[in-house]
């Protein structure tokens, strides 16, 4: 047997202390508090490295939790494929309920320019930087002014991970993050509440597009799978562009018209 493993040897011979497992459980319970105290007291380069490590751990933990929570996976149905006439767009299903996953074709379409269609609002008032981005002063004496807070409605995807607050330049408040839009179909003359997939183009600035800022005239992509729209080839349409027609920051909701 290797040397210096006397504790393991003792445990093999006589077993654990009677309070060993209880002590271990309590120590693990205290660990979070001790780490928090340590993080608060640390300063300088050590603190930076420690916070970076903690931030990476938290991201990993959140991703693991999210992975366990995922239920919308591809599953086989026990029911057999219905006999008789089946629409063309259901032929490739083979009795499977598919998760709401965007195909590569839609991802490719997202990259195309939004200026392909005639939009309901061809001209809109440009939004100035002072209007959209509020200067946030930071530092002990509030002398630093490099942070900006978005004051308009914005869209943030599901897979978005914030940077550590210390290094985050653009702050997008939770109260201004929207995930759904009221989209009107111009031909059907009906309005649907559809999930937003992304911001295609904000006419005011490319910066607002990357930040996902939604103002009047912005072209957004919405999930139209619930409408049951089909292409000429018989495939279901997942994503379509729509233009925002109201001022969401004033109305508290996003109203848009589908670009057909």
Swiss-Prot record:
Which gene carries the instructions for this protein? NSA2
List where the motif Nuclear localization signal lies. 11-18
Its quaternary structure?
Component of the pre-66S ribosomal particle.
A GO cellular component annotation here is:
preribosome, large subunit precursor
Q: Which InterPro entries match?
A: NSA2_fam (IPR039411), Ribosomal_Se8/biogenesis_NSA2 (IPR022309)
**Protein name (database record):** Ribosome biogenesis protein NSA2 homolog
Q: Which family does it belong to?
A: Belongs to the eukaryotic ribosomal protein eS8 family. Ribosome biogenesis protein NSA2 subfamily.
Swiss-Prot/TrEMBL keywords: Isopeptide bond, Nucleus, Phosphoprotein, Ribonucleoprotein, Ribosome biogenesis, rRNA processing, Ubl conjugation
